[in-house]
């Protein structure tokens, strides 16, 4: 069985790392390069950088900081935010990113997923899914979630979108359960289980990690391939080496920390 991945997520705004609760009230968490190097040294398996203002502000991601990160770390990293064309994705990948993640642009033009997969290969194409449970009990997707004032509901069931994204060429799905984001009460295991039943590509859990047990629950109960987290790593509440030792003690296979 492949090792499960531990993935710090760094939300980027104006070249700084920020973090909010349920995508609101963002506070500064530090320098992007310093945090990236820290996580690399601690044994992170990969990193995700999300330019949270790019899509809501209808601009492209700034490749200057991508080039800076690529020179500093030697683990895979993915870039998300404002990637709305093959040309933009090419700039991001050529700047040093290993993968691109698309979310709002794919909802506006789903064929973008196929275009990117055809051009760069499915291994480079991640589809991020921001999901909210609505009053009727159904999970539905949101777009432009990087800015609470611009977030839009989309009349599309989360599970239906996961199926369509795979059909169009997504090589990986990151399911961000927005109701859990930043509150540290655990991943939405029920939603992840339903997504896992439909997901034939790697599935990454996002939103809600607050304790080491939450990672184990996502791996054991939802069989996700990786777990993404932000605030617990940025704040120092959980250190990656200790987390990996804990997971190995739970018979969950993770890569060694070198």
Curated annotation (Swiss-Prot):
EC number: 4.3.2.10
Cellular component, GO annotation: cytoplasm
Top enzyme class: lyase
Pathway per the UniProt entry: Amino-acid biosynthesis; L-histidine biosynthesis; L-histidine from 5-phospho-alpha-D-ribose 1-diphosphate: step 5/9
HAMAP family attached to this UniProt entry: HisF (MF_01013)
Pfam families (alphabetical): His_biosynth
Compartments, as annotated in UniProt: Cytoplasm
InterPro entries: Aldolase_TIM, His_biosynth, HisF, IGPS_HisA/HisF, RibuloseP-bd_barrel
Claim: Cytoplasm is one of the keywords in the record: yes
Assigned protein family: Belongs to the HisA/HisF family.
Molecular-function GO terms, alphabetical: imidazoleglycerol-phosphate synthase activity; lyase activity
A GO biological process held by the record: L-histidine biosynthetic process
Domain of life: Bacteria
Keywords of this entry: Amino-acid biosynthesis, Cytoplasm, Histidine biosynthesis, Lyase
Name the UniProt record assigns to this protein: Imidazole glycerol phosphate synthase subunit HisF
Function: IGPS catalyzes the conversion of PRFAR and glutamine to IGP, AICAR and glutamate. The HisF subunit catalyzes the cyclization activity that produces IGP and AICAR from PRFAR using the ammonia provided by the HisH subunit.
Subunit structure: Heterodimer of HisH and HisF.
Catalytic reactions of this protein: 5-[(5-phospho-1-deoxy-D-ribulos-1-ylimino)methylamino]-1-(5-phospho-beta-D-ribosyl)imidazole-4-carboxamide + L-glutamine = D-erythro-1-(imidazol-4-yl)glycerol 3-phosphate + 5-amino-1-(5-phospho-beta-D-ribosyl)imidazole-4-carboxamide + L-glutamate + H(+)
Active site: 11, 130
Coarse class of the protein's main subcellular location: cytoplasm
Keyword match Amino-acid biosynthesis: yes
